[in-house]
């Protein structure tokens, strides 16, 4: 099936190059914190574990993409999101405005709406987070969550889906302070004609003609890919439903963000990070299915806003060896394991290091017996000593994360962003325009030029 997908993508590229027309359906995917290292880590993991190649890495057109903001070589998501959405640079922290906040930029989504296209915004994070907000918001600070929520409501876009709206009644003045009681964003949305949904079953039952949608799949963000159960909504499902609801004769613009890639980049957590990239790839597959039905009318672009974590494939401790398949042994995110560990301590008064060893083996595949030179997941004497010390100091999750990175051969240089260029790939109508070396502002400006 994977080979058929890739074959179809390449055939589309050949057919369209002969006489392309402007696309009616424009689908932009953004991996927050996703640069080439994250793409390739996920690719190698997928190959080693039998999943196959990532479709995002095998689109026919590629462009190395510069991400610098006006205030720093190292951008944040607000400035990068604004550049990708609006085609103009700004300073870190700004959303859809100049560095001084005096001039508003028009995003490709807003222009599409003005030209009577339907518009959708999807993310794994809160819908008023920096990247998605860059397509409809205009604020001096990305932290103005409530005000960005108001911008969301006033955008009149057709489809919003993700982790809900952060601080729907206002952000507390300081940590621990009570939240303000401003008019609830969800109530404002309903008054503006949005159908506000929080139930997955009701959401999945939506059909074309349902009207404007604001769907909150979970409070804060949808479940991490590594932790998600069958009952949890996925980015692929949010994307597929968006494609279904937005389709019309005029066309649509849909932006889909894999926002949680960034979260696990900041945390330097390889296993969870790569699974978010795979989740984004699954969402892109839904777009490719759609393109198969509308091959000459669809453009799919996949990019990142910046790199997060300074991730490297290979580090001093592993030399020239890498073992990406070892990350398959990790069954939960580090934060989820922390919660499980806390619950286990509460449930058993005499909870001991022997108890935690069983949990470590169950959720990470690490073995406390055996020779690490012969058994890949066996712990060395130093690693066992580090884990026991971490258990005594209540720092076990962080030490487990470090050991799993070491086992795979993954290194990290920072808990913040880096200035690495990102990779942009594209397929479909006019995809050839995303080639060579470009700036992130070029993405919006190219897409704007394709709107009729």
What residues fall within each predicted segment?
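Hydrophobic h-region of N-terminal signal peptides that target proteins for export
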Residues: 9-17
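Small-residue-rich
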Residues: 80-86, 90
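A post-motif C-terminal structural segment
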Residues: 24-25, 34-40, 44-82, 132-452
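Active-site-adjacent structural elements in enzyme catalytic domains
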Residues: 22-24, 33, 38, 43, ...
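Positively charged n-region of N-terminal signal peptides that target proteins for export
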Residues: 1-4
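Extracytoplasmic mature domains of secreted/periplasmic and thylakoid-lumen proteins
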Residues: 89-157, 164
């Amino acid at each position: 099936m994977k080979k058929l997908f890739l074959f179809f993508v390449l055939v589309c590229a050949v057919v369209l190059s002969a006489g392309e027309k402007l696309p009616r359906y424009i689908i932009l995917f953004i991996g927050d914190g996703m640069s080439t290292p994250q793409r390739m880590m996920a690719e190698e993991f997928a190959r080693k574990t039998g999943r196959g190649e990532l479709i995002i890495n095998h689109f026919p057109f590629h462009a190395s993409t510069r991400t610098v903001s006006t205030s720093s070589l190292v951008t944040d998501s607000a400035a990068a999101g604004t550049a990708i959405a609006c085609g103009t640079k700004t300073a870190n922290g700004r959303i859809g405005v100049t560095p001084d906040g005096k001039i508003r930029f028009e995003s490709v989504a807003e222009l599409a709406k003005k030209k009577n296209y339907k518009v959708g915004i999807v993310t794994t994070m809160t819908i008023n987070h920096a990247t998605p907000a860059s397509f409809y918001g205009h604020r001096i600070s990305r932290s103005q969550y409530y005000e960005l929520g108001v911008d969301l409501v006033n955008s009149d876009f057709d489809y919003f889906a993700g982790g809900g709206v952060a601080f729907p009644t206002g952000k507390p003045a300081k940590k621990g302070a009570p939240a303000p009681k401003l008019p609830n964003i969800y109530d404002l949305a309903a008054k503006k004609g949005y159908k506000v949904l929080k139930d997955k079953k009701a959401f999945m039952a939506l059909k074309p003609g349902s009207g404007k949608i604001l769907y909150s799949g979970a409070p804060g963000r949808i479940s991490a890919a590594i932790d998600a159960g069958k009952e949890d909504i996925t980015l692929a499902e949010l994307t597929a439903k968006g494609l279904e609801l937005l389709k019309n004769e005029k066309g649509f613009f849909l932006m889909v963000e894999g926002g949680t890639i960034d979260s696990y980049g900041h945390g330097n957590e390889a296993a969870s990070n790569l699974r978010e990239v795979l989740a984004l790839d699954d969402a892109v597959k839904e777009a490719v299915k759609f393109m198969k039905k509308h091959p000459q009318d669809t453009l799919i672009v996949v990019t990142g806003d910046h790199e997060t974590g300074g991730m490297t494939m290979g580090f001093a401790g592993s030399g020239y060896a890498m073992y990406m398949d070892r990350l398959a042994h990790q069954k939960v995110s580090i934060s989820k394991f922390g919660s499980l560990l806390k619950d286990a301590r509460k449930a058993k008064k005499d909870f001991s290091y022997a108890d935690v060893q069983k949990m470590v083996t169950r959720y990470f595949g690490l073995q406390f017996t055996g020779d690490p030179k012969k058994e890949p997941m066996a712990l060395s004497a130093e690693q066992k000593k580090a884990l026991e010390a971490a258990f005594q100091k209540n720092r076990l999750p962080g030490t487990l994360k470090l050991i799993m990175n070491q086992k795979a051969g993954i290194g990290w240089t920072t808990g913040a962003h880096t200035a690495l260029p990102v990779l942009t790939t594209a397929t479909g109508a006019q995809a050839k325009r995303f080639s060579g070396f470009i700036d992130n502002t070029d993405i919006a400006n190219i897409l704007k030029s394709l709107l009729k």
